[in-house]
């Protein structure tokens, strides 16, 4: 059983049962949560806010389905991180080579000036 979070324009949210998805982890988690809620509070105290929350969500502003898993979600981010990493390595190598050549040129000029004296 899947669940959907709906967030309205005021920032309030509620859990909505989604009968099209069957996720045993979510079902077990929800069952234990409900069992804990019923064990600690009365049935009416739990059911009343839950029913009231469902009636307030006619037009959700953001709807996030927690059971949809897409393998390509993080692929673009990973490729961008790899590209930036390679770019930084290239820039570091170019800077190192430039500093090395500059120091080598300065040392050579210094030794040549000492030899001329």
Swiss-Prot record:
Q: Where in the cell is it found?
A: Host membrane; Virion
A GO CC annotation recorded here is: virion component
Q: Can you tell me where the transmembrane regions are?
A: 71-91
The answer, when asked if S-adenosyl-L-methionine is one of the entry's keywords, is no
**Glycan-bearing residues:** 29, 65
How is the protein disposed in the membrane? Single-pass membrane protein
Per UniProt, which keywords does this protein have? Glycoprotein, Host membrane, Membrane, Transmembrane, Transmembrane helix, Virion
The UniProt similarity line reads: Belongs to the asfivirus B117L family.
| Stated name of the protein | Uncharacterized protein B117L
